Amino acid sequence: MVMMAGMDDHERKIVQEFCHLLEKSKQLFNGLRDLPQYGHKQWQAYFGRTFDIYTKLWKFQQQHRAILDTKYGLKRWQIGEIASKIGQLYYHYYLRTSETSYLHEAYSFYAAIRGRAYYSRAAKEDRSDLMVKKLRYYARFIVVCLLLNKMKLVRELVQELDTQIADYASTYEPEDQVEWNLVLEEIKGFVKAESAVGVLHADSNPVVLTHRLGPLTSPPIERSPPMCLTLQEILIVGNSADQVKFSELSVDMFRMLQTLEREPRDDPTHMHDASPAGRLPFRPGPYPPENGMPRRENPHKYLLYKPTYSQVQVFLASGFKELPANGALLLYLSADGCFSTVKHPEEMGYDLGGVTTSNKRDPEHGKRLSGGKEPHCLYPGDLYPFTRKPLFVVVDSDNSYVFQQIPRYFGQPLMVLMSPQETPSTLRDVRHGGSLFTLFLHSPLAAFCLICNVGSLAVHHWERCQNYVERFLIEASRLVIRSRCDIFDIGL
């Protein structure tokens, strides 16, 4: 509780306004978790109000730092907490919009916390909850750095997190010590799996590879009248039981997410700034119109880690609903197979099985009755309603082939890309670190090196091989685009 005695009217008003802004920001931030994860109109206005209040709060504490330090007792970890909340806002806005520019904004505020050591005295407060805030900050910062391919910084942060967890455990002997050690192991396993092949400079330092879309990595596209579709909505589902993951993101999901994004544009004004001091968080606005239609840098994505059947259907329906004219929906499934016991299949949409969905939130409801279908399974027939609009399905599963018979009842474009059902015995252990099929989609050369047991190679060899891959992609793209459209009327 702040003591108002000993303050003049001006100081009292400043402290009261700060307390009001701080409390209002907490209320709005806590309300974010109640917003639906799907749709657009349902949450954009609320996010806008939350950004507005945090902008005012950040500006206010900058302008009145001296009074807040002496009269309110503002501590550095409290400033760090505000910066951390702003970083979280930008990260979650990225998740909801798929625009990578917001990742840079999140990175800027997270980097400021580390650069200015806002949490450096958290341990001296002798409060375990502050240490937990610090550990959570590290975990969130690592996720953002992973998505921005700042691997050198990721390794530094992992080492720092390791030290912080050890200090936390020795000081407080907390009940959640095992959970934090598990988080640390997940991060280390994820970083190890993510680098399927090591590319080295002449001095043996690793090269940071990027596999997002960019001018140098995307084949040039010749626009023609039949090319009227654009990818607008994406649903990425990860439900492989034995696969490395971190923060609700499996390795397969992480790779596919980057494969379907354009390379982030570095902002030179604060990419290397140690602090966001002197600048304000900006409120994300509507996408700039292009020819009267909203334009987005990237297709909108939903990321679902081990979702239930109901969740898959809800998010699919939301993406389907949001599709504009001439828009296409992409569904990516990385999941274990759900196999059928039907000896004489009649209904191809359900009798051959599908891929598993989670039952963790619904263990009792919908148990399989004798002779009935598995309720916690996504069947090919479940996708039939969504073929009313252009649909692209990518299935990475040991039961992928069952999706090859999806009919085109509504005459809309449909493509189904399926993984092999089996992996050579010598490569079966690889799936724990990510599916080979998804790795080929993400980085064909890295996948080729993996199956050839090439763990590392010099950067000049990598670049030479990559040139061959790019030449193939350019030629393949040219042939596909110039081919007759009706050859894609069947699922591939």
Regions found by a protein language model. Give the residues of each.
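Residues that mark the junctions of alpha-helical repeat units in TPR/alpha-solenoid scaffolds
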Residues: E17, W43, T50, Y72, ...
